[in-house]
Amino acid sequence: LVGRAVALGLVRIDSPAPVPTWGAPGDPRARITWDQLLHMNSGLWTNGPGNRTDEAYIGGSTVSQTAGTMPLEWQPGTNFNYSNNDIMLAALALSRRVGRGALAFPFAELLWPAGMTRTTPETDWRGDFILSSQVWMTARDMARLALLYQNGGK
């Protein structure tokens, strides 16, 4: 989805991702780029491999509360750490960048054009996509996603 936003000119991959909880003046997390989130080298603290994101998945928390409050542990771009939070934050930033059409964006710009009509990405109770998991799809839609990936997004 971020790749589609790049193609549409909505996102520059090397620019900071607009995560709403990082808006305080001087917050060093505000310099974390889209690229660092997508490569899982944001430098944000996690509490273990993959980190625990159950609060957003089943605990009633929001993406912003679960992922947006993690402090920096390393300099961004220096350490890879598999992190669901980084993907959740990229999705949150994308929603903020897209604005009012954020809930329709995955369907209009990726899923339906690829023929993935039986895919459902879940949101938290505020309507922010989770996307680190909680995406339900048929095997055929998964195959369509694989073909899209194999063909360089075309």
Question: What kind of feature is each model-predicted range?
Answer:
Residues 1-13, 37, 90-94, 142-145:
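Active-site SXXK
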Residues 3, 64, 108:
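Short glycine-/small-residue-rich flexible loop motifs, especially phosphate/cofactor-binding loops
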Residues 5, 41, 93-97, 149-152:
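Generic structural signal for hydrophobic core residues of well-folded globular domains
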Residues 7-44, 69, 98-133, 137:
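Active-site helix/loop module of the DD-peptidase/beta-lactamase fold
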Residues 24-52, 60-78, 85-88, 137-140:
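Conserved catalytic neighborhood of penicillin-recognizing serine enzymes
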Residues 56:
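Conserved catalytic core of nucleotide-sugar-dependent glycosyltransferases
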Residues 76-81, 91-97:
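Short beta-strand->loop
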Residues 86-93, 133-154:
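Active-site-proximal alpha-helical segments within enzyme catalytic domains
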